[in-house]
Amino acid sequence: MLKDFREARIKEIDELRNLGINPYPYSYNKTHTTEDIKKQFEHLSNGEVTDKRVSTAGRIMSIREHGKSAFFHIKDTYGRIQAYIRKDKTENYEFFKERVTVGDIVGVEGIVFKSNTGEITILVEKFELLVKPLRPMPEKWHGIKDKEVLYRQRYVDMIANDETIKRFRMRSDIIRMIREFLTKKGFFEVETPILQYLTGGASARPFITHLNALDIDMYLRIATELHLKRFIVGGFDKVYEIGKIFRNEGISYKHHPEFTSIELYQAYADYEDMMNLTEELITYLVEQLYGTTKITYQGQEIDFTRPWRRVKMRDFIKENLGVDIIEDSDETMAKVLAENGVEVDINDRGHMIEKLWDLVEDKVIQPTFLLEHPVEISPLAKKHREDPRVTERFELIIYGREMANAFSELNDPVDQLERFMNQLRLRDLGDQEAQMLDKDFVRALEYGMPPTGGLGIGIDRLVMLLTDSANIRDVIAFPLVRPEGDIDIEDYTDLEKSEIIEKEGGNKA
């Protein structure tokens, strides 16, 4: 039984203490990562031994015993490396043989050689046990099949699957590269409130909380837009924020109620400038990660070679559904939606337009800028300079998904107030996603906001694309899952369902 495993491990740890060995030492002097060692010594010939000494640490993932010696693999953030331990070379070989198993976290020190089969290996001279886990590791070949367990116990997923660590390293690299790119462009990274008195900047249902100190209800932000624009009013030319956004909506393979976005705003720019910036940024990321402008996502080649396709929302919907979202009546649009199995409120033209787009969005595979959204669904965007029925707005669509959203930002306070009032009318009609009236934002605009281009990109969806991940929860380290209830620290039922092996001996192979 797995409960017996835990009890045996606790007993073993007590025995270590009785031997004067601290089973949880305070630190370890690690000179190299596994990646450092492999890069530094990749030039060695097969069988070549150096006199260079290294020390590294990590979790033992496998052990192969050979009489009075053993090979084992250590895993850290950067990968795995082989270590070789021999009775005649290692000070505490007997301790290793008797006490160390797969899953233990250890530190090793020794010289480096390349095995006869060409694998960089550490010949261990000194060895230290750093942690002995109380729980067994996932079985090597079967691992965890239950996705809910993977998401809930991501730490186990990371231990078992090297690809998981690689994916989250890439996420970190992508965010770092975005920051580096924008810094070189002269953008300042700023911070805006997560707790807000009003929500704005997007059409979404917010999470509500209560601030005891002031005895008022507050909201978790659904966007950073309105506060970032206040920076532009105040005199910043270029600002951005990378942070968490919260929307009390559904969960799907491409939606998550808590997600990460970047919004940026540039004074004296418009949506054409934002299109160019978006192309440049994402192409830069693709080239930095893959050395090319073409990647494969879910078996489909995606080509980021510039310039990207540009198409008007009106034209694309008319081409695919035969309805004109600018000229046709509400009744005509409602009829087309009904023919496609979508029932809507005929009094909400903006909602009908969004539903029509939903029907055709997945037809767009290659990077495409969808342009000129109607005013009804773009309350914060400037009206188009040549056609006031639409706005200077674009969405970037890749593989049937919105990746970015951008405007020539509305900076006319009278027009902005009028659009806010229209949003209030929609709220009165029951649309809980319509935007609230932010009077302070209107007041800020009355002080004067220069012509401004704004851009928002969903970081999680971007990481999905760049890591070939099918589900948004695969790129969020600790996504939302159903609560599992009270956890009995000695209960392994959740792990038994996930095919965790029952015997320690099965690991030592």
Curated annotation (Swiss-Prot):
Mg(2+) 2 binds at residue 402. The keyword Magnesium applies. Mg(2+) 1 binds at residues 395, 402. PROSITE patterns: AA_TRNA_LIGASE_II (PS50862). InterPro entries: Aa-tRNA-synt_II, aa-tRNA-synth_II, aa-tRNA-synth_II/BPL/LPL, Lys-tRNA-ligase_II, Lys-tRNA-ligase_II_bac/euk, Lys-tRNA-ligase_II_N, Lys-tRNA-synth_II_C, NA-bd_OB-fold. Its EC number is 6.1.1.6. It comes from the Bacteria. Homodimer. This is Lysine--tRNA ligase. It comes from Fervidobacterium nodosum (strain ATCC 35602 / DSM 5306 / Rt17-B1).
